[in-house]
Structure formats: C-alpha cells, structure tokens
C-alpha cells in the first residue's frame, strides 16, 4: 500500500490510544527556547497533534497538516482538551501548495514517509515556506534504524544522513546537526533504541 495515502494512515491511527503519545517529541521539547509567542509555526505531518498542541501551548500560531482525517480528529480532540486553538488542515504534502515565506518556524518530526524523489518536493516545500530568518526543527531516523526496527519506514532510502541534510540545507545556518542513538518512548509506534538525526537550521 502506498504510504502517502489517507487510507494507510487512517488504518494506523484508527485506535483509541494516541499511537505516538500526547507529549511532544523530546528533541522538539529541548528546543523550547526557540518558540516565541505569536510566531507562525507549521507542523508538518503532525498526526494526532502532540507537537502542534505543545507549540500552541507556548503561544505559537500553529498551522498543522496531516493526510489522515482520523488523525486530525484525534488532534482536534487533544487541542480542545488542552485548551488551545490550532488551524488543522487535511493535506497530502506531496502535492500541497506550499506558500512562499509564510512561517517563522517549521517543525518536521519523523516525516520520512516519502521516498526519493517524492521527498525532494517535500524538502523544497519546507525551504520555500519559511521566512528569511525562520527556523527549521527536524528529527528523523538514519539508515541504521532498519536494524532497530523500533519505528519509522522499512526502507533505508527514506532515512536521513548528515551529508544528505547538509546537501539540502548547507546554504542555511546550521545551528545543530547530530546523528546519535537513543531510547525513544513516544507511544506504541516509536518505542525502543533508535538511530536518530537532529537538525536545527536558520533560513538566510
């Protein structure tokens, strides 16, 4: 099944629990000092809302995208429970019309559903939609994640490496770029020792 289809993700999210939990991604939370009240933030492939809700709680004006209506319904419930307002939109990021220089912040956490060359259009969209001076916060898996099998896609070609991220964002100011292994505990679908890569970069 094509992992970019709504049906694939609806089937995954159609359970009572939040499959990635309701707490924000740990790397994102470690960057809390970069979140400013009133900044416009885009949460890419946000799923059940854990990251967009956290951003909104810190005063960001959040636009959250996901392809799955079921995930978005759960995200709206989470936002209501936590008392925040978020602009949720159902969208296939591979053909979404990315706006020009719209956001102060883009959050891209484990968005490795798209293989090459489809992901190139996704990266191009991220580059396009950030304002000059805007921040990208990204976490993904490296190819070694295939050995751990504790989350993420089953294909190494979907994974990120430091050279690949430098190829995509080498003309930006890279504040943080690190490959590492760590234990992830983010719901039932991201649990266990994992091969990770973190990026914080500023668009010139």
Per-segment meaning from a language model:
Residues 94-105:
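A short acidic, Gly/Pro-enriched loop at the edge of an enzyme's catalytic core
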Residues 157-178, 197:
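Short alpha-helix
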Residues 1-36, 38-47, 144:
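Conserved class I S-adenosyl-L-methionine
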Residues 113-126:
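A short, conserved alpha-helix within the catalytic core of class I
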Residues 82-94:
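Conserved SAM-binding strand-loop segment of SAM-dependent methyltransferases
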Residues 133-141:
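Conserved beta-strand signature within the Rossmann-like core of class I S-adenosyl-L-methionine
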Residues 68-70:
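Conserved SAM/SAH-binding beta-strand->alpha-helix loop
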């Amino acid at each position: 099944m094509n992992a970019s289809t709504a049906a694939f993700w609806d089937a995954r999210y159609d359970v009572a629990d939040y499959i990635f939990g309701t707490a924000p991604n740990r790397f994102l939370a470690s960057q809390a000092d970069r979140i400013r009240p009133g900044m416009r933030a885009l949460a890419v492939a946000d799923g059940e809302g854990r990251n967009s809700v956290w951003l909104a709680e810190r005063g960001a004006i959040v636009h959250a995208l996901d392809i799955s209506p079921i995930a978005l319904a759960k995200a709206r419930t989470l936002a209501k429970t936590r008392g925040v307002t978020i602009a949720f939109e159902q969208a296939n990021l591979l053909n979404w019309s990315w706006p020009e220089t719209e956001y102060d912040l883009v959050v891209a956490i484990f968005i490795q559903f798209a293989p090459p060359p489809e992901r190139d259009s996704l990266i191009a969209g991220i580059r396009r939609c950030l304002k000059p001076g805007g921040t990208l916060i990204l976490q993904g898996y490296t190819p070694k994640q295939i050995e751990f099998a504790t989350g993420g896609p089953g294909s190494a070609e979907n994974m990120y490496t430091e050279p690949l991220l430098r190829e995509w964002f080498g003309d930006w100011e890279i504040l943080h770029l690190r490959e590492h292994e760590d234990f992830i505990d983010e719901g039932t679908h991201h649990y266990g020792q994992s091969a990770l890569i973190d990026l914080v970069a500023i668009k010139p």
